[in-house]
Amino acid sequence: MVPSATRASRALWVGAEYSNIHAGFPYQSNQHLWGIGGFADYHLSPHIAVEADARFLRFNSFYGETEDNYLAGPRYLTRYFGKFQPYAQCLAGFGAIQYPFQIGSGRYFALAPGGGASYRISHRLALRGEYEYQLWLNSPNIVGEPAHMITPYGFHVGVAYKVFR
């Protein structure tokens, strides 16, 4: 018999979230994009999970700018502190941008380290909040713009539902 403290706790959580992101373009702007997204977390053990996210930042745009991203990667979960469970993650994938004033669009490889916490409401329901800093490599690659990569960052808040354990 395997002790419960070491028993694998495979579970699938799915959810939706609201994002408020400091836009990475134009460089050094104070523009924030808002949007919605979805995620899925598959817990392999009590402390290791794999996450996949899709976010669509389409609101409060700067002259038509939008940013979307599709990311996946590992997530490390700490022990519970009451109903809170902090976590750290490092996701990778791609970010897509429609530049302002319809000057073009681009897709870039993105790295996204971040962290947050989930708050268990019930056995199957949790709230979560996280901070993420994205690095869009080889961007923006536009003539006349500084050679600084696009680095959107900000907060996500959402709700998750445990599909199965």
Residue ranges: model-predicted function:
Residues 23-26, 58-62, 98-103, 140-147:
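Extracellular loop and loop/strand-boundary signature of outer-membrane beta-barrel proteins
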Residues 1-16, 79, 83, 163-165:
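Outer-membrane beta-barrel biogenesis signature
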Residues 119-165:
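Predominantly the C-terminal beta-signal and adjacent terminal strand-loop region
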Residues 19-39, 53, 106:
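Surface-exposed strand-loop-strand hairpins of Gram-negative outer-membrane beta-barrel proteins
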Residues 18-22, 55-57, 92-93, 132-135:
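Generic short beta-strand segments
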